[in-house]
């Protein structure tokens, strides 16, 4: 029988309709919300024992009623209706309340289970009734009470210990009867049961119903409230039912989501149900996961109380108090019940301990008050957050201040402002804060009030606008009427005066004008032409004929002339002329936004046909409009010609003769949706296709909640500018999504930009949202999307019928939770639809990083039933791409039908355009599948084939990535692409050479001939043929198809640097391990046979120990010696892998063990034992130690008695490096001799014998591809090994005692090396007496000898060297090498390097020339040194008269005043006249405004304007204005202020003058002083003695007249004389100035030519970046600037310098200029 939790409150809420009816009968009204609030919140606070879940105890109800109806100030009149209704439910209980009421024991019958007769055996338990039966029993009339049975007494609620009851004596004692559920011995009498309603229960107990069979009557139902209790010292036990466990599991959050809620639930279960140890285990098993259960048990064992009540640490006490295995507790005894109580106590402590999460205050700060959330609910949610994410109790007094501050800071804005203004906020408790917040919350306006307020404000704004407009119209009308009246009066403005008895018409006396017989009676006054606002029908809006093009139609029988307006979406009438419909629309016009109504459908006569149409009524519209809606029905065409616009139909005829049917005949001409599917598929499954079923929505998926990272804060990025074409392109998609509900308006602190992406090959745009910032702030989930590389491996090759479905708008099928929708908001403005604000997605958006994984998992769950019900087909899913494969066409058809049915029922939609139904050849994931084989699509091959040669490392990586997708079809891909891998690094110079071009073309050629590969069949074994060449592993994965081996994949990979340095027989082992690991993605664990040209298995089992490390060997053996999966075939020299193209011939068969045994180091005759006939025996050693924080190092070579060589090494040299140096020096000194050399360094010994050759083979790289340590010393050692005639390098133990020669020599070498390390200068070598001094003999050419003689040097006959003054003259070749080495060490300049060479013992002829040659060729120095090209001063281009050529610039003036920061300065280059305007901003709008409003009206239209490259000058606004006006806007070279020298100098002059004036006057407003500064600038003489004022106006400067007294004659100069003076100025001043300003011949001031390599200055270098970047190739030149490849702007010649010549194609040949097909382009080529 199912167990349910029923309380009085939940019972009344379930039957609230009956409660409301009963209250109505009592003449009161109750509401459900208040009923629940009073019962659970208000009445428990009255302290009368009212439980939160309600009670049917009449005494408690009466106490609450007394409190509520208290006449004093503490009464609650609003709760009277509810408590009297509750009282009536108890006094007059309905059927659904009676089973829960206790009837006082007034009858002889008591509550007792019926006895089982002694002569009857106990029947088996009856079957448990379903929940429906239980509910039916609740509504039946109560059965007569059986005799009282003490088993049915409920336990107390406050403690799980045995109850202490106050028995009520029954009127009639019950007979003693044995119970069937307890022991046979029962006391003769039992007390009456207490009342069933507890006084203050912690939780209402679950209701249990059980049926027992009476002695002589039918079975009756009895209620038992608890499963485990003490009755006559016997325990009654009822286990948990499946329905209880299911309800607890389903209707409560998991422990990981909300540990507090689940802990409270388990706590209530432990208190009310009193479970046993087994019940607790079952409860934990159902409600917790395995990991959560382990944590709870671990925490519980930490809280087992000891004898003193504190947690114990003794294992025996812990095991006794909280056993992990089932204990043998006897619950009928007090110790057993006490043990169970301790167990429950520890278990509850463990739940609370395990539920504590790590402290994360950031999570608490994210809890903010919702828009419509009450303060009490928000406080409860905040307290729950503190309990969940912090270790302290938020209700503790010491933490209330923290909670209060969080409540205030994270509350809504209006509540937060109110609480922050409270006085003494620290003294307020949490309840007081909630109470204050409730006051603000309750004062908020309701949505209805807010809407009414907005409507009222809108009406007030419209009234104000109408009154203002009427006021203006009244003024206009008054002015017009006054003018008319004045015009009618003719010449006499006033009428003649008329006497009292005189006629105003005929001027005769005796009658008035109304009785005048001469006045015509029937003449009508002509209607005046009224103006706007006059009250006349002819003058009303819309009365006149509209302009062309117009069209007259009959609307509802009334002829109406329409203005054809293609910009109007709907047709408009100015008058209703009939009834209006209830339909309204908002209309956005020039005067604002108003709501207008629509007419009912009117009949429109088109001449020969009738249509019905509904018009929008807009009285403010000047004319009736014929909009696009009616034009679309008419199929109208508008043609514009010189005669005017014509409205014609499709055939070119006037629109009046067009007939349109009543049923909108235009729909017949619509192009139907074309699909490649038969109609039967669309008709049978309309809900499965996007074309017929619309947008889908997953029916079985809950809304998705997006989790944010703990530190995530909202990000708001403004919308990028968007072109009109792009905006209109994505507008249709936005409108569609709004109509479908995929988008909705919102207000969100989050905002990301929307990007319009043009679809390739079309003019359509699609909206793409930039969600990169959102992706950074959301929690990452593990991607479960399948790998397309091995997805098809699960497809059986014999399944040759396929169906491919592509789900349409797949991500939009999954809804987003409302709390996650605001994350994806973006800006959108659409004035036509009245949208200006933010929109957000209600479905899962595209571009979100977790969308593919979330959708893939959701679709996989929804298709689980299909996979299990149809095992005869295979269904592959890659996100929204589905592939169904079947062995026959019939099976494929049936599977497809079931799949479409399943998709339609689950709410997904497939694209009919892209569907491939029941075909033998389909395209899926870029592959073509047919007959169990796959190959690349032509489109993918063409994409790779069209890729041009790369120009930088990024493009090389892009090409390799695109081609790498097809590597399974390219035999030997890694070998073909090997030359290109070196160009992928950014650190290496990019040089595209012939070998790279050949590799690039070879990959394309191999792709064009890509073969078809078979699909892997996981039911068959695989064979892998392997070979290795030049560090490239190549393989062919095959499967048997009859007698043939069909290729499944071509594999190739490059070995790592370590394995590449091994001998060939070991490289094959590394190659095999790499390809076996890669092939596992396709074989999926099936048996694999490996066949190679080597005896691979023997090498893997017993490899040589000198080549490979133990870790790598263990990895190889674990991978290759797995006999269950990998088998080795016999060595085969010719196999598919060895037949792949290689650049060298095939090797002959060999024995791998013998080859490895014969593999030697660098020198074949190098010995590790003493030579018997050695010329000398030397001992080497290196020393390195710390001395006062400095590492000192030295090296030495000794012979046991004398020091052969010793030297101190630079500080910081390691001991290994010193050992290598010492051994290398000993080998160099043994050149041409037989030598025994001892060393105690294992590192030096192994490097010379073994490791050196390995390093050399793998390019001196480590396993990570980095350079090895001591690379230069190892190279020197490997070279020095070949200098002696014979040599033996012997290892000896270090620091040995004894007198044998080896120990003595080793100790001497160690002592001398240590002494050398302590020396600060070089210790020269001391040769023994019997050893001659070694002298280097230089080789001189005839040119070297001539130069030596020229400087006075002589030849030394002994050394055969040329010497002068004790210095050796170096040959030119050796001198050049020496200078290069010294410059590489120091990078000194010419002068410093020459001084350094002069201090050496060598003399170099022509040293200055060689030094200059070396320094100029150093690329590093050219990039870093500050030297630049010096160009001579030139002439700037100026105008030939004033106002023609202007220079313009912005300059900032500090301090700012009144928001004005900048000064826009114009300088006329001819006269020097200056105009300056203060501005607040530095924008292109200001520049265009000043040109149009200031320069153009006063000085005429400029021809040329020069400026720098500031944003205000290069913007589209400025450049567009110049293009429209025909102005040549010249942008000067970047970072070259000399190009704008005139305006730059004027900026300085103006600011200097302003500074002086501010100091003199004390004014801070520099704008008031600007006119004086301009006065000085305009009257300052130039180098020709003329002021700008004189050049412009032809008169003396106004400053000269200030010194003279005023004379009236000075201002009476004849105008003609002035004009003649201006003419003379133009002839005598303007012409000579123009001649002086002429630039003359344009001579090139720099040495750069087209095709040269130059470095370009980096103007803003950061950190340690070089000062110069490049080199670049010069494409174009001018006399002062150059244009280089790779930089868009022109570069001034002073910002470039020549790069040192490098050999290659750019160093020879000439450039030739050719024309191209495009007249705006030229072609450069080298010959």
Curated annotation (Swiss-Prot):
Q: Extract the coiled-coil ranges from the record.
A: none
Q: How is the cofactor bound?
A: The RT polymerase active site binds 2 magnesium ions. Binds 1 magnesium ion for ribonuclease H (RNase H) activity.
Motif position, LYPX(n)L motif: 128-132
Boundaries of each Reverse transcriptase domain copy?
Answer: 736-929
Q: Which SUPFAM superfamilies match?
A: Acid proteases, DNA/RNA polymerases, Retroviral matrix proteins, Retrovirus capsid protein, N-terminal core domain, Retrovirus zinc finger-like domains, Ribonuclease H-like
Q: Locate the residues binding Mg(2+) 1.
A: 806, 880-881
Residue positions annotated to bind Mg(2+) 3 are: 1449, 1508
Q: Where is this site: Cleavage?
A: 129-130, 226-227, 477-478, 533-534, 658-659, 1335-1336
Which intervals carry biased composition (Pro residues)?
143-165, 188-204
Report the CDD domains cross-referenced here: RNase_HI_RT_Bel (cd09273), RP_RTVL_H_like (cd06095), RT_ZFREV_like (cd03715)
State the protein's name: Gag-Pol polyprotein
Q: Which gene encodes it?
A: pol
């Amino acid at each position: 029988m199912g167990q349910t939790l029923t309380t009085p409150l939940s019972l009344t809420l379930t039957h609230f309709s009956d409660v409301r009816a009963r209250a109505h009968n009592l003449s009161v009204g109750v509401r459900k919300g208040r009923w629940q609030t009073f019962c659970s919140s208000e009445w428990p606070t009255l302290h009368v024992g009212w439980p939160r879940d309600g009670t049917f105890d009449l005494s408690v109800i009466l106490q609450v009623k007394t409190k509520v109806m208290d006449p004093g100030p503490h009464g609650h009149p609003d709760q009277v209706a509810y408590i009297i209704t509750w009282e009536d439910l108890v006094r007059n209980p309905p059927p659904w309340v009676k089973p829960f009421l206790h009837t006082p024991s007034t009858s002889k019958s008591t509550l007792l289970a019926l006895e089982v007769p002694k002569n009857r055996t106990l029947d088996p338990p009856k079957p448990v009734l379903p929940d429906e039966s239980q509910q039916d029993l609740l509504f039946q009339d109560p059965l007569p009470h059986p005799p009282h049975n003490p088993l049915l007494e409920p336990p107390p609620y406050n403690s799980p210990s045995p109850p202490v009851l106050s028995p009520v004596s029954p009127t009639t004692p019950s007979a003693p009867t044995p119970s069937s559920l307890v022991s046979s011995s029962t006391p003769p009498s039992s007390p009456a049961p207490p009342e069933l309603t507890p006084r203050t229960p912690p939780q209402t107990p679950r209701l249990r119903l059980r049926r027992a069979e009476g002695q002589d009557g039918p079975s009756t139902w009895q209620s038992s409230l608890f499963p485990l209790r003490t009755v006559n010292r016997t325990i009654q036990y009822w286990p948990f039912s499946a329905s209880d466990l299911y309800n607890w599991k389903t209707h409560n959050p998991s422990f990981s989501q909300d540990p507090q809620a689940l802990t409270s639930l388990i706590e209530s279960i432990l208190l009310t149900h009193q479970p046993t140890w087994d019940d607790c285990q079952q409860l934990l098993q159902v409600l917790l996961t395995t990991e959560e259960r382990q944590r709870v048990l671990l925490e519980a064992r930490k809280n087992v109380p000891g004898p003193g009540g504190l947690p114990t640490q003794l294992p025996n006490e812990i095991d006794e108090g909280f056993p992990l295995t089932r204990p043998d507790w006897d619950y009928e005894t007090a110790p057993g019940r006490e043990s169970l109580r301790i167990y429950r106590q520890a278990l509850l402590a463990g739940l609370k301990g395990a539920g504590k999460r790590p402290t994360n205050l950031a999570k608490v700060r994210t809890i903010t008050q919702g828009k419509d959330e009450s303060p009490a609910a928000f406080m409860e949610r905040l307290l729950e957050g503190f309990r969940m994410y912090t270790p302290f109790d938020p209700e503790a007094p010491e933490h209330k201040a923290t909670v209060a501050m969080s409540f205030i800071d994270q509350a809504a804005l209006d509540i937060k402002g109110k609480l922050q203004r409270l006085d003494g906020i620290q003294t307020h408790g949490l309840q007081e804060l909630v109470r204050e917040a409730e006051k603000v919350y309750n004062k908020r306006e309701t949505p209805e009030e807010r809407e009414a307020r907005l409507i009222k404000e809108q009406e007030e704004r419209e009234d104000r606008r109408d009154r203002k407009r009427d006021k203006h119209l009244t003024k206009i009308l008054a002015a017009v009427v006054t003018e008319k009246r004045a015009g009618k009066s003719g010449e006499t403005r006033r009428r003649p005066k008329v006497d009292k008895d005189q006629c105003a018409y005929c001027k005769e006396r005796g009658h008035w004008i109304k009785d005048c017989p001469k006045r015509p009676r029937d003449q009508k006054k002509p209607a005046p032409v009224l103006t706007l606002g006059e009250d006349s029908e002819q003058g009303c809006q819309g009365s006149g004929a509209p302009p062309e093009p117009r069209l007259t139609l009959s609307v509802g029988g009334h002829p109406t002339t329409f203005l054809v307006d293609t910009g109007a979406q709907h047709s408009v009438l100015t008058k209703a002329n009939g009834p209006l419909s209830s339909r309204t629309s908002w209309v956005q016009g020039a005067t604002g936004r108003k709501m207008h109504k629509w007419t009912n459908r009117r009949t429109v006569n088109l001449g020969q046909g009738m249509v019905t149409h509904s018009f929008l009524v807009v009285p403010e519209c000047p004319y009736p409009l014929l909009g696009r809606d009616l034009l679309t029905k008419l199929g109208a065409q508008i043609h514009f010609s010189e005669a005017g616009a014509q409205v014609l139909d499709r055939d070119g005829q006037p629109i009046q003769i067009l007939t349109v049917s009543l049923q909108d005949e235009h729909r017949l001409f619509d192009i139907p949706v074309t699909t490649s599917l038969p109609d039967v598929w669309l008709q049978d499954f309309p809900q499965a296709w996007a074309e017929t079923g619309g947008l889908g929505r997953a029916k079985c998926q809950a809304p998705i909640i997006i989790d944010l990272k703990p530190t995530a804060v909202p990000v708001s990025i403004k919308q990028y500018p968007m072109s009109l074409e792009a905006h209109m392109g994505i507008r249709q998609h936005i409108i569609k999504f709004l109509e479908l509900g995929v988008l909705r308006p919102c207000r969100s602190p989050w905002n990301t930009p929307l990007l319009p992406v043009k679809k390739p090959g079309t003019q359509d745009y699609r909206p793409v949202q930039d969600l990169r910032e959102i992706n950074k702030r959301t929690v990452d989930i593990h991607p479960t999307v399948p790998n397309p590389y091995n997805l098809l491996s699960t497809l059986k090759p014999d399944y040759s019928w396929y169906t491919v479905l592509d789900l349409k708008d797949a991500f939009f099928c999954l809804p987003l939770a409302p709390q996650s929708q605001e994350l994806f908001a973006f800006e959108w403005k659409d004035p036509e639809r009245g949208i200006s604000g933010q929109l957000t997605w209600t479905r899962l958006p595209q571009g979100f990083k977790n969308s593919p994984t979330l959708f893939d998992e959701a679709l996989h769950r929804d298709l689980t039933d299909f996979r299990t019900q149809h095992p005869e087909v295979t269904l592959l899913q890659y996100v929204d791409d589905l592939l169904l494969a079947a062995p026959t066409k019939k099976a494929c058809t049936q599977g497809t039908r079931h799949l479409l049915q399943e998709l339609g029922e689950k709410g997904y939609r497939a694209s009919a355009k892209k569907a491939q139904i029941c075909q033998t050849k389909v395209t899926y994931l870029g592959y073509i599948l047919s007959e169990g084989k796959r190959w690349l699509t032509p489109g993918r091959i063409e994409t790779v084939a069209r890729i041009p040669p790369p120009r930088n490392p990024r493009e090389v990586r892009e090409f390799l990535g695109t081609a790498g997708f097809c590597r399974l079809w390219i035999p030997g891909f890694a070998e073909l692409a090997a030359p290109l891998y070196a160009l992928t690094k950014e650190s290496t110079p990019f040089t595209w050479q012939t070998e790279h071009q050949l590799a690039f073309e070879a990959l394309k050629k191999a792709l064009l001939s890509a073969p078809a590969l078979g699909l892997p069949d996981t039911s068959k074994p695989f064979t892998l043929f392997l070979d290795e060449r030049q560090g490239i592993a190549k393989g062919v994965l095959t499967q048997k198809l009859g007698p043939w081996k069909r290729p499944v994949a071509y594999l190739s990979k490059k070995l790592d640097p370590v394995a590449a340095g091994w001998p060939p027989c070991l490289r094959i082992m590394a190659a095999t391990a790499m390809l076996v690991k890669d092939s596992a993605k396709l074989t999926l664990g099936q048996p694999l046979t490996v066949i190679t040209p080597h005896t691979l298995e023997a090498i893997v089992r017993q490899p040589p120990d000198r080549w490979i490390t133990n870790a790598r060997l263990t990895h190889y053996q674990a991978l290759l010696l797995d006999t269950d999966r990998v088998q080795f075939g016999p060595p085969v020299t010719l196999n598919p892998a060895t037949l792949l193209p290689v650049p060298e011939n095939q090797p002959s068969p060999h024995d791998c063990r013998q080859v490895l045994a014969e593999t030697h180091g660098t020198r074949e005759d190098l010995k590790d034992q003493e030579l018997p006939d050695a010329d000398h025996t030397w001992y080497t050693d290196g020393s390195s130690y710390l001395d006062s924080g400095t590492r000192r190092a030295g090296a030495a070579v000794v012979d046991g008695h004398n020091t052969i060589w010793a030297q101190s090494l630079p500080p910081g040299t390691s001991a290994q490096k010193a050992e290598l140096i010492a051994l290398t020096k000993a080998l160099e000194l043994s050149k041409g001799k037989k030598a025994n050399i001892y060393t105690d360094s294992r590192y030096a010994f192994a490097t010379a014998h073994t490791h050196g050759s390995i390093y050399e083979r793998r390019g001196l790289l480590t396993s990570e591809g980095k350079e090895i340590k001591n690379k230069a010393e190892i190279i020197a050692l490997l070279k020095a090994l070949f200098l002696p005639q014979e040599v033996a390098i012997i290892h000896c133990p270090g620091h040995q005692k004894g007198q044998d020669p080896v120990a003595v020599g080793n100790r001497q070498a160690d002592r001398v090396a240590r002494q050398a390390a302590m020396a600060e200068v070089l210790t020269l070598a001391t040769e023994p007496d019997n050893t001659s001094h070694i002298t280097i003999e230089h080789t001189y050419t005839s040119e070297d000898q001539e130069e030596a003689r020229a400087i006075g040097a002589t030849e030394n006959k002994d050394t055969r060297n040329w010497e002068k003054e004790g210095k050796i003259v170096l040959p030119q070749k050796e001198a050049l090498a020496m200078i290069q080495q010294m410059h590489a060490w120091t990078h000194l300049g010419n002068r410093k390097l020459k001084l350094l060479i002069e201090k050496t013992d060598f003399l170099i002829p022509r040293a200055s020339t060689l030094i200059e040659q070396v320094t100029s060729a150093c690329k590093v120095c050219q990039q870093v040194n500050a030297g630049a090209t010096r160009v001579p001063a030139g002439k700037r281009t100026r105008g030939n008269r004033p106002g023609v050529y202007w220079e313009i610039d912005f300059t900032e003036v500090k301090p700012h005043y009144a928001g004005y920061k900048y000064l826009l300065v114009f300088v006329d280059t001819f006269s020097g006249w200056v105009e300056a305007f203060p501005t607040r901003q530095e924008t292109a709008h200001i520049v265009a405004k000043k040109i149009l409003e200031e320069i153009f009206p006063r000085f005429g239209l400029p021809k040329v304007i020069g400026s720098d490259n500031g944003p205000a000058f290069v913007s589209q606004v400025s450049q567009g204005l110049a293009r429209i006006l025909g102005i040549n806007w010249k942008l000067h070279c970047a970072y070259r202020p000399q190009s704008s020298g005139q305006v730059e100098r004027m900026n300085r002059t103006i600011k200097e003058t302003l500074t002086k004036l501010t100091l003199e006057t004390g004014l801070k407003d520099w704008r008031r002083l600007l006119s004086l500064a301009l006065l000085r600038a305009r009257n300052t003489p130039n180098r020709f003695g003329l002021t700008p004022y004189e050049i412009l106006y032809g008169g003396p400067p106004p400053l000269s007249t200030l010194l003279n007294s005023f004379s009236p004659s000075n201002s009476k100069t004849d105008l003609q004389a002035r004009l003649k003076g201006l003419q003379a100025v133009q002839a005598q001043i303007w012409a000579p100035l123009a001649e002086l300003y002429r630039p003359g011949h344009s001579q090139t001031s720099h040495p750069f030519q087209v095709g040269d390599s130059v470095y370009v200055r980096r103007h803003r270098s950061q950190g340690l970046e070089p000062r110069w970047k490049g080199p670049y190739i010069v494409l174009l030149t001018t006399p002062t600037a150059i244009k280089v490849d790779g930089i868009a702007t022109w570069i001034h010649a002073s910002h470039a310098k020549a790069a040192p010549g490098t050999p290659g194609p750019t160093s020879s040949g000439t450039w030739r200029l050719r024309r191209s097909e495009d007249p705006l382009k030229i072609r450069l080529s080298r010959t």
